[in-house]
Regions:
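Short acidic/glycine-rich loops and adjacent helix/strand connectors
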Residues: 1-121
Length: 121
């Protein structure tokens, strides 16, 4: 299961198995809130119903790199806020408990999104 944008902008979920996209959905389609940054149970349940329970969660950025960027930018409060750490954020979704999280390089996730949704082999 890939999770993108959750916590701060345009939350989305995808399920990919053996290079095939089994499910892709945006939180805003479920909540009817434009650019919704919060995942919701309906979206996650649909993802699991279509693609099966994931064996790993691929998170769209490395949280410690983000915290370092916030520190360098002088965003002291944000850099110290642990409520936005993916492991804590995902605790509110029981269907994702005990699934390991693998953190990805943020810009690589953008590239993967373009690659996997393109019509080219």
């Amino acid at each position: 299961m890939g999770i993108s944008g959750a916590i701060n902008h345009d939350a989305a979920v995808s399920i990919v198995h053996d290079g095939e996209i089994l499910f892709a959905g945006h939180a805003e389609r479920y909540s009817k809130k434009k650019n919704d940054s919060d995942l919701n149970d309906a979206l996650l349940n649909d993802a699991i119903n279509y693609g099966g329970k994931p064996d790993i969660i691929a998170w769209y950025e490395k949280p410690m790199l983000k915290k370092l960027r916030q520190l360098r930018a002088g965003q002291w409060q944000l850099s110290l806020d642990t409520s936005e750490l993916p492991s804590q954020y995902l605790e509110k979704f029981p269907q994702l408990k005990h699934i390991p999280i693998k953190y990805q390089k943020h810009h690589y996730t953008h590239a993967a999104s373009g690659y996997f949704t393109s019509p080219y082999d």
